[in-house]
């Protein structure tokens, strides 16, 4: 699991017998966590749920191709064969490698993109490990909503509009509105900086101003 141990029992044994950190479980609520801390006689820090962010917003209708891929139907195989025929070399290939490895049935493909069931996700990170293009990243959810730029492309605006249409165009609106604190555009791609966030409104107020609506939330 996300705690780094084989099972809940294995984790519990390490806590009791080896003094392992009792605050690594991300699927229990705060009340249960406090009970565990009290039972083992330690104080712990708040542990936030960890969710996978999919840095791509292109559904099947947005994915421009240069050739039809007929090889082995896995993302890893397709990525090795001319990127599966996709013109965007950064986007989701949509062949379900991430959903297949999820042990909690928390990820499902919908219109060519993996969708996360936040109620089932335990933050184990197996989906991120399975993605050959590294477009899935695990991130702590400290507020009701977690905002992110759903794009991984470093292509310029002309290329993005040509082969996708829903990606980041590096317009800089998010960076300007946040005065460079919450968003930063580097190499044609905007990225969020959660270390500067103080409230949910910080990102929520900027999200609707994005011209391509590529700032998503989960």
Please place each PLM-identified region on the residue numbering.
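Ferredoxin-type iron-sulfur electron-transfer modules and their immediate structural context
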Residues: 1-177, 199, 204-218
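Minor-groove-contacting beta-hairpin "wing" of winged helix-turn-helix DNA-binding domains
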Residues: 114-116, 190-193
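Short, loop-centered acidic/histidine patches that primarily coordinate divalent metals
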Residues: 179, 195
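Short, solvent-exposed loop/linker segments at beta-strand-coil boundaries, enriched for Pro/Gly
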Residues: 182-183
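Polybasic, proline/glycine-rich intrinsically disordered low-complexity segments
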Residues: 187, 197-200
